[in-house]
Amino acid sequence: MAIINKDKATELILKQGFSGSYQSEQVTFLLKRTHIEPTDTAEKERLIQSGEKHYSQMISLENAPTARHLELFEQAMQQGQQRLAQEVQQLAQTLVVEFNEPIVLVSFVRAGVPLGVLLYHAIQDLGRDCVHYGISIIRDRGIDFAALETIIARHGHASIVFVDGWTGKGAIRQELQRSLGNDTRFIGKPLPLVVLSDIAGCAWLAASGDDWLIPSGILGSTISGLISRSICEGETLSADEITAENIDQWHRCIEYHHLKEFDISQQFIQRINQIRLKLNPQSNAVWAETQQQAQQDQSQQVVHKLAQEYDIQNINRIKPSIAEATRAILRRVPDLVLLRDADDEDTRLLRHLTQITKTPVQVVGDQIAPYRAITLIQKLGKG
């Protein structure tokens, strides 16, 4: 039974939800807007690794992308926009077969949001009703149960589809399982996590397991509705603690108004939509269990081998995949970048960032397959 009734949930969403720089029908963020003082990147790294603070309690200032960064993003778009449009269409076609309407897309902030908006449009264009929310899930702390229960109170649980951009090591999938694996509403079938690229081999549905340059993976808020990653300064509410009185206590985020002139969230969606609408008929996305398992085995072997080779006790210091490796350079204190190929077009931005940050690079060939890039975070404390 829902914690609040449908009318109360609708009222709460309309009152407290927002859409950032997206159109209101494209996504509703179930996050509370906040302001906290930014933490210097090096100090944040020290606090994380010392255990003094969890990463979700702090955030560093997000700077405007440089002209070179935007130039490399445009190259990524030229390379990948056709593939992205095709894979969005393939995923949407599978979703309309698998779920009854309306499909309730629940994207994980931030990486899932651009894909969620694209899927929203593709599902609508297939003639099916769809709604889209952006909520928080935090490694080690779980999904935002208050936000999720608000959605369930309004729409039920049967047609919920969780959306993320890709899987790196599979940490968010593990967090989803830990949060909802014993929830009777979701028992009996795999948790429906949809991603573009399931490199870690742990998603319910993916367009591929390739580590490729997903354009939305190499920008931050300026392609995700001008919001920060989610923030949770205090203790998180567990599933059992949600009541009608605290169901509005969603995780938080910052709106980055200072980056408004650089925001391309809408242009990105429009551009991919225009390509998608001109596509030839596409086959439905299929992510076979055998394919998924092979991917999972290979990716786990790489992570475990690197942990041994570089004496890494905390595997959160290993950031595999082009997208994760790039984000780690921008947001963390990198120690080393491992590349599969020295001249890979898809790692051009990553290589540019290593030059700026003076991060060492090693080309290691197929040792890191299926990944094409991995960033190792600098060790500042234990492990």
Swiss-Prot record:
Keywords associated with the record: Autocatalytic cleavage, Hydrolase, Protease, Thiol protease
Task of the protein: Cysteine protease that may play a role in regulating cell morphology in response to stressful conditions which likely cause oxidative damage. Appears to catalyze its own cleavage, which probably leads to its activation.
Enzyme Commission designation: 3.4.22.-
Biological process per Gene Ontology, one example term: protein autoprocessing
Originating species: Acinetobacter baylyi (strain ATCC 33305 / BD413 / ADP1)
EC top class, as a word: hydrolase
Disruption phenotype: Deletion of this gene causes hypersensitivity to tellurite, altered population dynamics during long term batch culture, and, most strikingly, dramatic alteration of normal cell morphology.
Phylogenetic placement of the source organism: Bacteria, Pseudomonadati, Pseudomonadota, Gammaproteobacteria, Moraxellales
Family, per entry: Belongs to the cysteine protease StiP family.
GO molecular function: cysteine-type peptidase activity
Annotated control of activity: Is inhibited by bromopyruvate in vitro. Activity is not affected by the presence of tellurite.
Name used for this protein in its record: Cysteine protease StiP
InterPro entries, alphabetized: PELOTA_dom (IPR028157), StiP-like (IPR048336), StiP_N (IPR011215)
Entry PTM: Is probably processed via an autocatalytic removal of a proregion of about 100 amino acids.
Induction section of the entry: Highly induced by starvation during long-term stationary phase, while shows very low expression during exponential growth.
